[in-house]
Amino acid sequence: MVVMAQTKLCSDIEIPKEVYNKWKDFIKLVGNIILSIKQIPELEGKFKELLKKGRYNFKSDDFGGQLPEPFTRQKVIEPILEFLGYEFTSEISKKSPLGDRKIPDYRVSVFNKEILIEAEPLGSDLNKKDSGIHQVKEWLIIKSYGVDTGIATNGLEWVLLHYDDTIKEIRTLKELNLKSIFEYVLENKKDKDLENELKQVFSEFYYCFSKEYIEEYIEVATKNIKHKKEEITNEFYKEFVKLVFGFEDVKDVKKKDKSSSEKDKGTKKCLYNCIEAPPNTSELDKKKFAVLLMNRLIFIKFLEDKGIVPRDLLRRTYEDYKKSNVLINYYDAYLKPLFYEVLNTPEDERKENIRTNPYYKDIPYLNGGLFRSNNVPNELSFTIKDNEIIGEVINFLERYKFTLSTSEGSEEVELNPDILGYVYEKLINILAEKGQKGLGAYYTPDEITSYIAKNTIEPIVVERFKEIIKNWKINDINFSTLDEILNEDSKIAENKHILRAFLDELDKIRILDPAVGSGHFLISALKELLQIKKRIYYLLREEMDIYKEKLGIILNNLYGVDIDDIAVEIAKLRLWLALIENLDVEALKRGEVLLPNIEYNVRCGNSLVGWIDENLKQLSISYLCDNVRIMCVLEGLIINAHNSEERKKLKKAKELLEKRDGYVLDNYVEAYHLLYEVYRTSHGLKANLLKELLDEIRDSIYESVTPAYFAEIYQNGNNKKNNGKKSKKNRPRVEEFEKLKPFHWKIDFGWIIKEEGFDVIIGNPPYGNLLSPTEKEIMKRRDTPEFDIFVTFIVHSSKLLKNEGYLGFIIPSSFGTGVRYSNLRKELFTKMCLKKLIYLPFDVFSGAYVDNCIIILHKKPPKSEDLVLIYAFPKKTKKISFEFKNDLFIEYSKILNDPKCRIFPKSPEIYIILDKIKQNCRESLTYLEDLTESTIGILASKYKFSDKKENEYYLPYLEGNVYRYETKLKLKNYVDFSKHKNNEKLINLFMSPEKIFIRRIVNRQDRIMASYGNIEGVVKKDLYVFVLKPDTPINYFYLLGILNSELISYIYIGKSAIALKDDFRQTTLEELRELPIVIPKNKNIINALTQLSKLRFELNDKLNENDRIFLENIIDSLVYGIYFQDLIPKEELNEICNEINGIIKKYDEKSIDCLKYCQNIIKLLNTINTNELVRKIRNKN
């Protein structure tokens, strides 16, 4: 007997050994199925033909009078489904409420989820349109059944499909054919080697498709796909930066300062060093050219995948060049003509040698701006004479497969545009020579960009739909979610007029990413809107033109701004690639479709500095109608307009530019927008003329607006520092101001600002103290926070957001509870309605040492009864799932009731606990700051030290550390405290003979580390010092027991976003001071906790682990009893405390032994351990 070893499926997925034990039963099942087929004589021979050829076109007569599909379902598919463990009932009706849409043959349950199964007749093609795979994909995309997994089968072939809501695409996770197993049984083969091979086929089938394992397989398979992408991305990026810029890896870059990196670039052979640029070219422009060249080459690789350019174009042209005797370099001989004379030139304008070149003659004109010669100054004068380096670049690119579609589990190395976003986001930071930390930029994972896009766009869509329903005066339709609106069973599904109005309304939604980076958020927004449109077209029973709809979304809905022009180019590239994915290549070659001009949707500029709607009092405008060239070009464009609509827009623009009365600037902004609308779908000479026109108009407006805005900020802006007085001190010149790259929203997106702003603003703004001194001064004069750039982005974006609009950012978690953000939270959360705040796991961003959260805001005043979702992922969560239970929502009043409007991570439990304490302990509740004076230790590097006490101001300096109930501090030397000689309060705190120390770091068990100290001296900054105020009704050991208790640690961790940090979880002095301290009136209880706490402290070095746990359990239980007075009756608690006080006569081990046998203590522990609230705190429920 041959024993099958445990094998791996693919991508290191191991199949459980138990699966192989089912082989014999499956063979028996297959035999029974074949017997049922043999019972129909006319079918048997044709079934053998099917197994031989793999496909056979059966007719109805072949099934002995039965229809092919019902026979296949009853005799083949259903027995196999039963074997796979599914319970099912066949659907009676094959029509949906829409009348002509199929519904699934089976809907089977897998635990709490459903899987759709579409059955097709034996021998049928599962890839045929409107059946099989196509049908399952349609169901998954439209979400009619609320499921994300489906199976298509014809009995022999089985295909597992899974919808990934993050990328809004369907993955084929497994395709498997049972033909060889049926053939093996039918022919009664006895080949052991063949049997072992077929056992492997069966094991894969059972593991991937059975009820027992399908969920496990889907989870592992999707995880492996993600892991494989990450590996490919990292490999590609490492090679990329080495080849293009000479850096070995990212860590190498981060270690180098500017001078050393420039030195390396001069010695290492890389693309950057081989670029020959025209005289006076800046280093930045040279870098931009290197990136632009790589953009173009990668873009061409994607064009190869789409069939727009010949396969292996770069490799073949390079090989031909090496064989030829061409005197000029490869870049000038092949790449320059390809970029500028082919891809950027319409076919009828190309030179004869280009039209007849075998490589270029069939390549269509693309348009779109990527291949224009004005992306870098003097771009046509750049060259690369080193052919070898270009060959290395081409060989590097040829090692990868570039695909515009999502990988479906192929083992081949593939790169798609989403992966390139990751590569380029890291590249942007290197090019800026600040590193990621300097720019505060990191690539945001798909699941986060998708979640933010979905949860900001969908609410707007729902609100817009409500307006449509209201306009149609339909009152009997109730809905609150998009799924309810787009459900096949809803009344809306039957009304095509409303659905078309809905489509039109979607085109009006304006979405902005003000820190666009590589365009990742815009791509997620594109996918979200496209998904909604797919569902509407499904209800309309119409085929959607995906290219047309993507084009409309990119031109009408999506806008971005970034201060880095390289980032802007990459963002545009990604949008073009998303569009090309669905491009009709034949239509492109016929000249019927072209790439749009999108450079005016995604702009370069400083999002934080520029005119929005301020009243510019010193504006002096130049009349554009005096510019003869502009007027002449416009006249020519009007004469040669493509159609009447275009002519109408051009005429209107000319009229607006000719006006000298009224508010001239508004007229110019409107004219600018009209010309852009014509430009974005223009090409060739007309596109070039329009672009020149647009740039000239924009430059002219900027020349007027920038000085006026500058004057408004520095003369009329708020200046609290000088009590509102005008001051020229530290005021920059307007030329310096222009270097900030001001972006005037009222000009570039004036038509949107005129409509009150953007509907949705999303993104991952940079974080940190990154604003320049000039920028900080501007923010101060605009009453905008400037201490962290992400805060500035939030405030500024709220001004750009339309009323009722949504804002979704990923920002540092410290915003949720940090003291420095208190004023901003109060202002934001009272003017805007917080919808969601989600604390993310550690290490969401590769290489980023900051914890993050997602914030979703709705620009409307909140109501007390509004609900807010607050959730904190466990910090080491590897797989993020954004499926939240309803009980995680809290009422808005709980946020507003907190004086600092903090968002406590452990919600809603922490709010429940704090409310319970306030209600139960009104008279006995106080706070740590009311009972103590406190301070933080010193930063040693800022002080002088001596081995002896030089004078009265040299205080003892203590070295060591503090743990729970353990103080390991000793005198090291003396610290010069003379700078604080007038701060008697601070000196007294450090020199107090008694105190409590608390470590700044929270331990790995999420417990505060506090201990008692009867030692005088100054301590380091890692320790906090607390000294009881005079006449405080408690003692140090009672307070120590409270601070070290399980409950207080839970409250602290639950309230503090800073304490959630995974690497070094921290406390802050401000947050510690707010800890609730309950002081019972019953002295007996105070004495009992004091005795227990002192016993734990005194015996620290003598206790074994079990005794330590036992003693701390009693302390924790007693604290629960003190804080939750309904847990234990007062009399019973008093009796327990009496016994404790009676038992602890001495602080020795005997006291602990006596406590163990005390029945009341055992009862106390049992009561606390079984309490539901306590179990939640301990995560045991």
Curated annotation (Swiss-Prot):
This is Putative type II restriction enzyme and methyltransferase RM.MjaORFECS2P. Transmembrane segments: none annotated. In the C-terminal section; belongs to the N(4)/N(6)-methyltransferase family. The keyword S-adenosyl-L-methionine applies. It catalyses: Endonucleolytic cleavage of DNA to give specific double-stranded fragments with terminal 5'-phosphates; a 2'-deoxyadenosine in DNA + S-adenosyl-L-methionine = an N(6)-methyl-2'-deoxyadenosine in DNA + S-adenosyl-L-homocysteine + H(+). Probably a G subtype restriction enzyme that recognizes an undetermined sequence and cleaves at an undetermined site. Probably also acts as an alpha subtype methylase, presumably on the same sequence. InterPro entries: DNA_methylase_A-5, DNA_methylase_N6_adenine_CS, MethylTrfase_TaqI-like_dom, MmeI_hel, N4_N6_ade-DNA_methylase, SAM-dependent_MTases_sf, TaqI_C. It comes from the Archaea. Its EC number is 3.1.21.4, 2.1.1.72. Keywords: DNA-binding, Endonuclease, Hydrolase, Methyltransferase, Multifunctional enzyme, Nuclease, Plasmid, Restriction system, S-adenosyl-L-methionine, Transferase. GO terms for biological process: DNA restriction-modification system; methylation. GO terms for molecular function: DNA binding; endonuclease activity; N-methyltransferase activity; site-specific DNA-methyltransferase (adenine-specific) activity.
